[in-house]
């Protein structure tokens, strides 16, 4: 099993696209039910959260969804900031241990965690 937990931050238009990507999956045959979208969001940033224990064979599915989400373009062009969706996910595999998945700059970067998050695996 693999424990996946994390979040994305975005704007209104991007959140609508994230929901479209998530809702395209059948929750009876995927782990798309792990996504949560707060009913009331505050200020300018919108949030999407994911939490769930999934089978290791489904990790490719989750990775593909994050890659799709990462490629959602900025709603408004800004030369100073990259306004595409960004976020952080901690992925704990029973065998391979923990990895950190960073969504930013239009892509997904998977690596070792920068912090000591192993207490989450207790």
Question: What residue ranges belong to the model's regions?
Answer:
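Short, extreme N-terminal segment that most often corresponds to the first beta-strand
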Residues: 1-23
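Charged interaction segments
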Residues: 21-122
């Amino acid at each position: 099993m693999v424990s996946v937990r994390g979040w994305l931050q975005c704007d209104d238009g991007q959140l609508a696209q994230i929901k479209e990507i998530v809702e395209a999956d059948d929750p009876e045959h995927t782990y798309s039910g792990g996504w949560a979208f707060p009913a009331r969001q505050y200020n300018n940033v919108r949030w999407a959260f994911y939490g769930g224990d999934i089978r290791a064979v489904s990790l490719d599915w989750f990775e593909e969804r994050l890659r799709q989400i990462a490629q959602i373009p900025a709603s408004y062009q800004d030369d100073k900031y990259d306004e595409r969706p960004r976020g952080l996910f901690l992925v704990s595999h029973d065998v391979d241990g923990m990895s950190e998945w960073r969504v930013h700059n239009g892509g997904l970067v998977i690596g070792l965690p920068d912090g000591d998050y192993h207490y989450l695996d207790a």
